[in-house]
Each structure stands twice: as structure tokens, then as C-alpha cells.
Amino acid sequence: MLAGRCDKLSVTELSMGGTLILYLAEHHPEIAGVIPINAPVFMTDNRVPILPIIRHLIASTPAIASDIIEPGIVEPAYDRTPTAGAHEMVKLFGVTRRDLGLISQPLLVMRSTYDHVVPHECAPFIMEHTASTDKEMVVFERSAHVVTMDYDKDGVIDSAWKFIQRLSH
């Protein structure tokens, strides 16, 4: 197990993975640092309120993939999203959003200016509702949702590396 081999653990993830690491940080205060990237804690899509019904009527919908500005870059992704899975994801957003105040670890929130998937208000919401006194938001001006594959990918790596290095000392 990684925790047994390291003095400090930091976690980072993109999109729904970012939501999952926020949830993880809420329940594991021993995590040294948290780096969500374009992490949703709510969605503004008008279909969200009817997901509990839709999931029984429609098995899946076209997936969102390759929200990337840099030409020629394609994100490997599924072509469909199960509606039951989307419903569970929205429930996770609610639980995670409710408990953001439990996060006291150092926090580096990253978001992209041209994200067409996650509402831009999520990053400031995370910043405002977490208890961490050591938090920073980095905005990437040239990328869309999949910033880790887009123009600003090196900036993501550099920002995360500097954050983790700072926490290591």
C-alpha cells in the first residue's frame, strides 16, 4: 500500500475523479494535499433533476469526450454514458458538496477557462466551502475540460509538482 511507503500522500484527479478525491479528503484527514482539476460538485444541466426518472427509461446517452482545444488531440473515452451511473454521480456531487467543510488539508484547485463540461462556478464554490486555510486556485486560460491533454497540460504538471514539493518540506 502506498501509504505504508510514503510519509505524505497528496491526491489529484480530473473531472469526476476530482470529485472523488474531494470525497476521499473529507473522510481521510491524513491526506497531505488535495488537487482537484475541473472537479464538479454540481451540474447546471436542466436534465439533472429528472435523472431519477430518465435512468429507468433510457439506458444511456451520448458521452461527453474530447473537450480539448488543441487540434489533433483526442481523449480516449467511452461513447455512451449510462444514465444510472450519471444518477449515482449526481448523488455523489451532493454528498461531496455537503461535506466540503470537512476538508482542512492544503488545497490546490485547478480549473480551465474554456471548460464546456463542468460549470465554472464549481471551483470558486470549492474554494469558499472548504475549511482549509492553505488553498489556492489556478486558472488555465488556454484549455478546455481535459486540461491534462490540452494546451496547458505542462502548467498543470508544474503547478501540481510545486504544490506537492512545498508540502513535502
Per-range role (PLM):
Residues 13-17, 21:
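Gly/Ala-rich beta-loop-alpha elbow adjacent to hydrolase catalytic centers
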Residues 19, 35-45:
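Active-site nucleophile loop of the alpha/beta-hydrolase fold
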Residues 82-99, 105:
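Active-site nucleophile elbow and catalytic-triad environment of alpha/beta-hydrolase enzymes
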Residues 103, 109-111, 115:
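Short beta-strand/loop motif that positions the catalytic acidic residue
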Residues 116-122:
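Conserved alpha/beta-hydrolase "acid-adjacent" motif
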Residues 124, 128-146:
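Catalytic histidine neighborhood in serine/cysteine hydrolases
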Residues 141-169:
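Catalytic active-site module of serine/aspartate enzymes centered on a nucleophile-bearing elbow/loop
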